[in-house]
Amino acid sequence: MAGSGVRQAASTASTFVKPIFSRDMNEAKRRVRELYRAWYREVPNTVHQFQLDITVKMGRDKVREMFMKNAHVTDPRVVDLLVIKGKIELEETINVWKQQTHVMRFFHETEAPRPKDFLSKFYVGHDP
């Protein structure tokens, strides 16, 4: 008796998932644009404040790259989660809760993907 009620409640809860912030994808996209603009405006201040060895253009290109990395996401809840994480990163950067090494960690050269098959791992020297 109690088990069927729990099962019914679980099935009802799984069909009606409440979004985090955005009601639809258009609102989620608006939040992403706002975050992108905030990061874009903050790059010159960050470069100056942390005395980074990069230009403002390189910083803005990296911001664009980081946003384009998640351009394929279509679920509004996932987009909201990514926006929340981006706002937290922005706040930490603005308030100088990070050090220069934390900011420069974003500017490492893109790493080659790890090999998948045995021979490639052997040639590169990775453990299987």
Swiss-Prot record:
Keyword list, A-Z: Acetylation, Electron transport, Membrane, Mitochondrion, Mitochondrion inner membrane, Phosphoprotein, Respiratory chain, Transport
Positions carrying Phosphoserine: 11
One annotated GO biological process: mitochondrial respiratory chain complex I assembly
InterPro entries listed in its UniProt record: Complex1_LYR_NDUFA6_LYRM6, NADH_Ub_cplx-1_asu_su-6
Bilayer topology term: Peripheral membrane protein
Residues recorded with modification N-acetylalanine: 2
Family in the record: Belongs to the complex I LYR family.
Subunit structure: Mammalian complex I is composed of 45 different subunits.
Name of the protein this chain belongs to: NADH dehydrogenase [ubiquinone] 1 alpha subcomplex subunit 6
Species of provenance: Pongo pygmaeus
